[in-house]
Amino acid sequence: MLFEQIAANKRKTIFIILGFFIFVLMVGAAIGIIVWNNYLNGLVLAAVIGAFYILIMVMSSSSVVMAMNHAKEVTSKEQAPVLWDTVESMAMVAGIPMPKVYIVEDPSPNAFATGISPEKGAVAVTRGLLNKLERYELEGVIAHEISHIRNYDIRLSTIAIALVAVIAILSDIAMRMIFWGSLTGGRNNRKSDNNNSGGAQAIIYIVALIFVILAPIIATAIQFALSRNREYLADASAVELTRNPDGLIQALQKISGDSKKMEEVSASSESIYFSSPLKSKKNKPGLFDSHPPISSRIERLENM
């Protein structure tokens, strides 16, 4: 059952990522129709901006994420022996280098991981998590975060965030060009085409325009769908590492029962946390939820 869940989640992720790339190209094609009356120009623009932005995002250091979330590095075992030992042992079981260890001085129990590859991984936990969890529960949470690193989830989420940003940029470019009347040549060409093909070109233009306007919203929904799926996969992978679903279940129950929201959290970092720092109590995931409901995560773990 465990390995079936892992395989199913991996397949679903592949489909989501492929769909994401296709969606970006579709947005580019729509912008090409709106701006140049030629979808190929838009495809090239989307591909170039997308590749450049992804490269910049992937090259960004995880230290930036740690700084944004006020995380301080643990440089020696003596500073946090239980946390250090847990991270070290889970990394060893996962077969990856030991990630850097950080602590966020916040009373709300939570954790997150960064690093686009296992060699550049880092794990951060809040002070509240260390104070509230037993060691076997902490192992479940750390195994979950180690799984994110091992499964290259941070790289995937970075690409997804970059693609959402690219779509927003492309949409903004199109809207600005329309607003400032920079499409005069395109409109003239389109008018000539419409004389020959009736209202077909006008309909295509309107559909493309509506698609570009809605694209950032749709892209954000896809990004969060990917994030929710990777949380399920990390839970299953954590059980694979610890062989003890009860530890992770107990940790989720304790975190769910804690009503404190994180005092200082970067809005752009919400999706990387073990549990949503906004403390949503919904039982069903919404389109724009970065995490599946804790009740759903617990149910899946109990069925393993």
Curated annotation (Swiss-Prot):
Topology in the lipid bilayer: Multi-pass membrane protein
Keywords: Cell membrane, Hydrolase, Membrane, Metal-binding, Metalloprotease, Protease, Transmembrane, Transmembrane helix, Zinc
GO cellular component: plasma membrane
One annotated GO biological process: proteolysis
Residue intervals passing through the bilayer: 14-34, 39-59, 159-179, 202-222
UniProt superkingdom: Bacteria
GO molecular function, one term: zinc ion binding
CDD domains, alphabetized: M48B_Htpx_like
Swiss-Prot/TrEMBL cofactor(s): Zn(2+)
Location(s), subcellular: Cell membrane
EC number(s) given by UniProt: 3.4.24.-
Active site: 145
Annotated binding of Zn(2+), by residue: 144, 148, 231
Pfam families associated with the record: Peptidase_M48
Cofactor note: Binds 1 zinc ion per subunit.
Entry-linked HAMAP family: Pept_M48_protease_HtpX
Family: Belongs to the peptidase M48B family.
PANTHER family: PROTEASE HTPX
UniProt-recorded name of the protein: Protease HtpX homolog
Lineage: Bacteria, Bacillati, Bacillota, Bacilli, Bacillales
